[in-house]
């Protein structure tokens, strides 16, 4: 595990791709929390969700940094360096109401 993120400078301002996990919305699945790819804007579900689509997106694309998106939490995670980033001054606004599942 790295001490610092070598990819922090690559964080992009992105437009979220969906109002929920893209893949879960297509299949009717549920999620716990959402993660936003700060390279392309893909919205995927967290690793506590059954399908772990945000991690799958990283594995398929190599896009290194996600943002804790729903709820907005002000942090990022670099999959490559395995470190948290402070995104509290650069949080992505939500595009609209996001469905929630219990």
Language-model region placement:
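Cys/His-rich, Zn2+-coordinating zinc-finger modules
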Residues: 3-11, 15-20, 27, 43-102
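Canonical RING-type zinc finger of E3 ubiquitin-protein ligases
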Residues: 29-38
């Amino acid at each position: 595990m790295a001490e610092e993120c070598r990819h922090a400078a690559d964080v992009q301002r992105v437009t979220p791709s969906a109002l929920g996990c893209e893949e879960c919305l297509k299949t009717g699945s549920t999620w716990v929390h959402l993660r936003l790819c700060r390279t392309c804007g893909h919205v995927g579900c967290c690793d506590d969700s059954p399908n772990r689509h945000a991690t799958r997106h990283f594995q398929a694309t190599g896009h290194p940094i996600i943002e804790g998106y729903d709820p907005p939490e002000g942090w990022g995670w670099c999959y490559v360096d395995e470190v948290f980033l402070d995104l509290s001054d650069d949080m992505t606004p939500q595009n609209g109401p996001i469905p929630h599942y219990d």
